């Protein structure tokens, strides 16, 4: 690690996190690393600055934030030799938990200095944008289709800071409980090449990591960033109680099966959606 950029959102985290970021930067400078901090104002700017870091010869880009910031940085450095490093400044920090990155930014900076870069497979989503144009993006943690995706779409970036955490979670719960669970078609290939078609899916998650941290121990048992596929969670029930039972199973670390929820490994998944499920596209491809 010689030449790095640290990308962060100055509107997120408050004064305390800015102080932690400055302390982490000092750790890098004290180790002889050429490091600079770049403030960003939007997801698109994070991705653009990450791409600039690649063209300017940086060997590492630090995502200083949560999983959303990591996602934006990955869009800019995927398929390049530039390494991703993390200073956990977000709310959930799922990828940091899975990688066992220290959650204090200064400790995370020290850990990055002694770490060795390694390649992992990325998930890729191909879809049609809201403007009707073909688009794609990469994901590291998970991708989803259904009510969870609707929730994240509605709870746009920055809402936590505007509403406060209590109001944010209240809004999330209201959206999740009131949004109609519609069925869509999922076709995926199993590791042995067998193609499976499910015509009654109400919720789909494609998960790349094992540990999400916090109270959620395992959302998708069998998922691993060391594999070259995703772990699918297919909910085939319109009952929210079924999905809640499955999530509760992960909260307590239990291994019991939940009727109406299936798990599978796959490298290629195709979803055919009713427009009411997702207004952005009627066809989504997920690859790993």
Describe the role of every protein-language-model region:
Residues 1-61, 71, 107:
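ATP/NTP phosphate-donor binding region
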Residues 5, 31, 40, 78-83, ...:
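Catalytic core of DAGKc-family lipid kinases
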Residues 10, 64-66, 89:
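Glycine-rich beta-strand-to-loop/alpha-helix junction loops that act as flexible
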Residues 26, 148, 158-183, 231-261:
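Alpha-helical membrane-targeting segments
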Residues 46, 68-73, 94, 120:
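Short glycine/serine/threonine-rich phosphate/pyrophosphate-binding segments
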Residues 144, 148, 205-221:
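Glycine-rich phosphate/pyrophosphate-binding beta-alpha loops
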Residues 190, 198, 224-227, 231-288:
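ATP/nucleoside-binding phosphotransfer catalytic cores, i.e., glycine-rich phosphate-binding loops
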């Amino acid at each position: 690690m010689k030449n790095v950029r640290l990308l962060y959102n100055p509107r997120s985290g408050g004064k305390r996190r800015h102080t932690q970021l400055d302390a982490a930067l000092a750790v890098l400078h004290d180790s002889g690393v050429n490091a600079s901090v770049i403030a960003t104002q939007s997801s698109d700017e994070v991705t653009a600055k990450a791409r600039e870091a690649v063209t300017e010869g940086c060997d590492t880009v630090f995502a200083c934030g949560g999983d959303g910031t990591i996602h934006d940085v990955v869009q800019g450095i995927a398929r390049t030799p530039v390494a991703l490093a993390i200073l956990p400044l977000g709310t959930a920090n799922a990828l940091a938990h899975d990688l066992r990155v220290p959650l204090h930014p200064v400790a995370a900076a020290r850990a990055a200095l002694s770490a060795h870069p390694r390649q992992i497979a990325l998930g890729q989503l191909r879809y049609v944008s809201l403007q009707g144009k073909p688009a794609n993006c990469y994901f590291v943690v998970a991708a989803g289709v259904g009510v969870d995706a609707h929730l994240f779409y509605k709870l746009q970036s920055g809402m936590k800071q505007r509403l406060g955490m209590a109001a944010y979670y209240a809004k999330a719960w209201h959206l999740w409980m009131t949004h109609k669970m519609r069925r869509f078609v999922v076709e995926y290939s199993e590791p042995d090449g067998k193609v499976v078609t499910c015509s009654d899916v109400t919720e789909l998650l494609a998960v790349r990591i094992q540990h999400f941290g916090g109270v959620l121990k395992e959302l998708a048992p069998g998922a691993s960033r060391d594999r070259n596929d995703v772990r699918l969670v297919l909910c085939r029930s319109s009952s929210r109680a079924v999905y809640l039972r499955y999530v509760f199973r992960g909260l307590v670390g239990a291994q019991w099966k939940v009727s109406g929820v299936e798990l599978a490994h796959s490298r290629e998944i195709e979803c055919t959606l009713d427009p009411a499920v997702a207004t952005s596209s009627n066809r989504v491809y997920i690859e790993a």
